[in-house]
């Protein structure tokens, strides 16, 4: 759930940095003195670099083989642990721990989101509508293009329903969060504000845990694509290479991916805004 890793965690992380920094704003990080902005940017860069390595190693398991549900559960446990771990990190002397929680939290969120989203193709193929389309394709009454179009539309429909429900749920969660903030009197002091942010991260992680359990217990273990003789790891690399060759023929998709990457980096909007004002 992005409220914890993407919204509140960056705020808590940067709060601790500003409170721990001396008057000149220079702190020791990775073996040399750095400004707060430099520390934040380096943390984001480290997180992004690790994500690249992680996805190159295990990313193909999201689409191929039978490991996706197990990997998703393991990654979710890590994400929940990070969220609850913030309860112990709300004072400036623990800013280094905050850096670690922030970096690992971003990685855990992005990987869980990826492996969760990868379930939609399997869900789409197992709907009644797509089973009927598959039978029609085998019988020769529809073309491959018609089947692929129906498959794409079903994936989009399921994803839109899921994200719609998530967005509606977040409205109620945000309302509860406002109540928690007033209950903890976060405006009374710096310490209250720090503690309030840690509580909010843990609360959202608890909601994430609560709504995830039915998925993990009720999800049917549908196999992913067959990697064939290549194996899962090689199939993932081959798919990446094939996509890189084809992307130049889909210039709109390339522009979309570049724009999405830039916007995602910009989601750490607190970082960008702070830099503009400093």
Identify what each model region corresponds to.
Residues 43-46, 50, 78, 104, ...:
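Small/hydrophobic positions within alpha-helical transmembrane segments
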Residues 51-67:
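Helix-to-loop junctions at the C-terminal end of transmembrane segments
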């Amino acid at each position: 759930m992005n409220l914890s890793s993407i919204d509140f965690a960056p705020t808590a992380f940067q709060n601790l940095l500003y409170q721990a920094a001396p008057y000149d704003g220079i702190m020791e990080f990775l073996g040399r003195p750095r400004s707060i902005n430099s520390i934040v940017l380096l943390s984001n860069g480290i997180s992004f670099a690790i994500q690249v390595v992680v996805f190159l190693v295990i990313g193909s398991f999201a689409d191929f083989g039978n490991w996706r549900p197990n990997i998703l559960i393991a990654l979710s446990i890590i994400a929940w642990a990070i969220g609850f771990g913030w309860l112990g990190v709300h004072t400036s002397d623990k800013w280094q721990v905050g850096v670690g929680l922030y970096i690992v939290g971003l990685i855990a969120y992005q990987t869980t989101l990826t492996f969760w989203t990868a379930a939609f193709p399997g869900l789409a193929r197992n709907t009644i509508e797509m089973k009927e389309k598959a039978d029609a394709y085998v019988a020769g009454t529809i073309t491959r293009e018609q089947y692929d179009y129906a498959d794409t539309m079903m994936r989009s429909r399921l994803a839109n329903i899921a994200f719609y429900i998530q967005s509606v749920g977040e409205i109620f969660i945000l309302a509860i969060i406002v109540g928690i903030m007033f209950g903890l009197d976060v405006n009374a002091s710096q310490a209250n504000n720090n503690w309030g942010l840690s509580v909010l991260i843990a609360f959202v992680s608890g909601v994430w845990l609560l709504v995830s359990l039915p998925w993990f217990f009720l999800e049917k273990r549908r196999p992913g694509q067959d990697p064939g003789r290549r194996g899962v790891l090689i199939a993932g690399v081959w798919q990446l290479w094939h996509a890189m060759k084809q992307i130049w023929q889909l210039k709109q998709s390339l522009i979309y991916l570049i724009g999405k990457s830039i916007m995602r980096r910009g989601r750490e909007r607190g970082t960008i805004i702070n830099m503009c004002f400093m």
